[in-house]
């Protein structure tokens, strides 16, 4: 059905033109006349009578005008009524005459959609699309078709959809679907649907609950989406739909979407009769008319899911229509009342029954706000009306009003009250050891209640500040929302016990008079037999005394908080109600300050930070290698800290600032191309240990060789002069004496010979001194002429660009697992021009498989009001509650009166109960305990292939293939199966901790896991908090107990630094899902499948000749700090791949354009001080030689584009000096050896 979308005006934005009265002709009907006799005679008689009785016309009387005005007014009133009825008529008209789009959809829907019914009501729709029957999963009920109702549906919670195969005989009724969704207008049951920006929207009011499952059609009648719900956004409503994208099902869910299945009425119970909770048809359904019966009905349905609907209906039963405002939130308090409860310290060091008793102090909010529950009620007056400026408290058994301005809270100093409603106060307080709440009553008397409570505002972030900054950083935190609307949090209430009041009794002679003062009074007297009852009028008891009677006021028209500080109503037992409470705890963001940036000074492999904290600020740092060596320190004053920067890098976090990262460079003060002392200084600053070891070894070797030479010379000398010394009167020849430094004529000392030469022959004296100098000159000249006896030794092990040459269609290479470092590989095939592939890791994610064991959080201890059994013994009953404890205590209260208000002669007992539940904060403040299993690794890789930069994502498992243009890449698996996560991890608010937590069901008191639950919302709770009930003190109603502190709170204080700060290899830890990002560990193999069409034949590529390379400048260990100029001659214009055949050199350019005779400049990076490398352009190689100098910057904030795995190489200059020294020492040894050999040969020949 093709049609052109027409402009329609249903659901238009503009209101219809206002109705105006049109000018009409007033028709006045004549009065009814009497019937006249027929015939001409009768007509003649009437005509004569008219002529005879004719009078002069007169002006109309005023009465006629008044009647006319009245008539006009009546017409105006009828017109006004028509105006009021006009919109209703128009709406009914609109429903009767649907627009073109609606008529179009109705025709298609007649065949392809079916109603889903539940208990006779339509809750949604099912649609026949393609070969499937589709129904929203949230729609409850059965399809209104016998064949479709029998089908077995498959449920998908991800898409909120249920699907089944269409019966064969119904396939012709199904609609087609399409994934083509150009922006524009589409059709559905209620008119037009606009599709723009990937969202479907309709005018607000066009859709409603019950429309879930309706299809959206295009102009050809094809289904483009199925409606699930909607989100009201003002004038427009965004639809939540299931749609298709290239045959893939997707779900579009705008924020705030509500499911549009028809809500089913929730049923409540009264006297074995069910009724809708929102519409109670019973007699006691209005609290204002029958309060006691209404509360009884609510207590009977307290566990029903529609309890709060019933409560709202019972409170809003008045026929008067009320506006919805903040007063409605206080409406529930009309069924409750304040109360008196026991306070341990009423301000004067003694306990009392206080009207402002403290029930509970909550401090879960991480922004430091306290939520305090007290026994009085704020914002409600005694007449149950709402007034922000008032509060009501219990004075004896009567509520009394007071001004809210007299309310105060303090710890070590006055607190700031930020919100109040009902029993609850929000306050921001300074740290302290106690908390006091008080107010001034209507008689100007101050009432206070003090509790021991250690309050220390929690730390948000990494700086201990005192006030919110104007500018800073937003961090996640939790706070109590300042809203009085109904929330998910609730408290239990019950009927209050009878309140004793002995002032109602007066002694009159021998009788007791009970004055009720309009109240219901329960009395019991022990005189002349048992005399007890319930009265509402004054009563006189004869022959009795006041001491023999007990009176108590009974009020069952209002509930009271189920407090452990007040007794339970013995008649009601466990009956109770519940009401919502304000100020829920929610997650939000808090602005925190950012510390001043430190003054950074770079040194050789060190960074010095000058810190200026405005308040105590945390400084932490870690190495980004295998051993993180994490340190942290609180800085309170100006301080200078020097930190060593390892080769793998350093991460420093200062306050709430983002982490600073530093990497060292191979900088030094010496040079590898200077004199020996400069060379030694160069290598000493780079590798001090290695340099010292090499110098020590060389010194030992040289000293040994020199010593050996001297030893051989001494041996030769001894061999030469010994025969002459043994012959009497022998004279040593002159030449031998000169060579062996021996006396020729007589055995004189060197001093005597020198004296003799100085006195007799001074020329010979000077010649004797010149002999060693000439020998040194000869040795130096020999060293100069000594040819190079050894080649340059390099000790560099650099892995930067793995250039592997292959001759196959398939190519494999290995790239380092370092993000941001480009890696190249050269692919060579016979007959084809070489191809260069450049790959760069942009991110590597390691995601473990997790299984949730449980969540743990703070617990709260529930202590219901104690049950006091007067004149008898109570019994405990078993209850399936977490950490439930129940004990019965005897001999607690006196037989007469006492704190339990008993009036009997037998023993009284108290039944105390307590159990543990998850705190209200568990929905936002909890830690999740996971088991971590095998991790999957995924990589985001940038590939330069065929002149295009393409980014792909793939699993690094060695199996998952991704396509880049026409090539297939298989990445992984990693060379190192390493993970920063242990087998057990804990996740708390975006932070991950390795922790060996206790298993489910084995928690220990006061430690992590003392309370456990499967999810934050689940009802199954395990607890072990060492809860022990204790004997109550006589004279006061209370439930004392002993309990271990919260293990969750203790863990929060002692948990230490998270993996975000302590993980090795520079891992960045993230959550949702839990993963480790960019861990620089190991290597990643890459297998590439390249088709033949991607290669260029040699005949088609340019031929390069006459190539020469000249390095203009070179700074080693820097980011492409070298520049080389290559001159060439190309046979034709084209594009050639550029690659360094030497692994130790990285070239930035993957390919260049060549033409004719020209030159090109390339940038390269190397860690060599003397770089000898070959550059391949197309198929031609050229040799380049570079003399590189160290970088000037000691520290940089980016990783090096190459990775060194050993010591630096030895420069050509250094090798030249090594050759000279080695040659010189070797020459001396050789000469000495030659002399010794000659001497030995001559000596042996003589003998």
From Swiss-Prot:
> What residue spans carry the region label Functions as an uncleaved signal peptide for the precursor of protein E3/E2?
261-273
**Cross-referenced SUPFAM superfamilies, in alphabetical order?**
E set domains, Trypsin-like serine proteases, Viral glycoprotein, central and dimerisation domains
The segment annotated Interaction with the capsid protein runs over: 715-719
Site label Involved in dimerization of the capsid protein, positions: 186, 219
Q: Where is this region: E1 fusion peptide loop?
A: 892-909
Give the start-end ranges of region Interaction with spike glycoprotein E2: 154-159
**Short sequence motif named Nuclear export signal, residue ranges:** 143-153
In the UniProt record, does the keyword Nucleotide-binding occur?
no
Locate the compositionally biased regions of type Basic residues.
59-71, 82-100
Active site per database record: 138 (charge relay system), 160 (charge relay system), 212 (charge relay system)
Q: Note down the stretches annotated as region Binding to the viral RNA.
A: 83-113
Instruction: Give the GO cellular component terms, alphabetically.
Output: host cell cytoplasm; host cell nucleus; host cell plasma membrane; membrane; T=4 icosahedral viral capsid; virion membrane
A Pfam cross-reference name = Peptidase_S3
Sites of S-stearoyl cysteine lipid attachment are 1241
Which chain positions have S-palmitoyl cysteine-type lipid attachment? 720, 740-741, 1241
Describe the location of the Peptidase S3 domain by residue ranges: 112-260
Which InterPro entries does this chain map to? Alpha_E1_glycop, Alpha_E2_glycop, Alpha_E3_glycop, Alphavir_E2_A, Alphavir_E2_B, Alphavir_E2_C, Flavivir/Alphavir_Ig-like_sf, Glycoprot_cen/dimer_sf
Instruction: Give the domain note.
Output: Structural polyprotein: As soon as the capsid protein has been autocleaved, an internal uncleaved signal peptide directs the remaining polyprotein to the endoplasmic reticulum.
As a miscellaneous remark, the entry gives: Belongs to the Old World alphaviruses that usually cause fever, maculopapular rash, arthralgia and myalgia.
Name assigned to this protein: Structural polyprotein
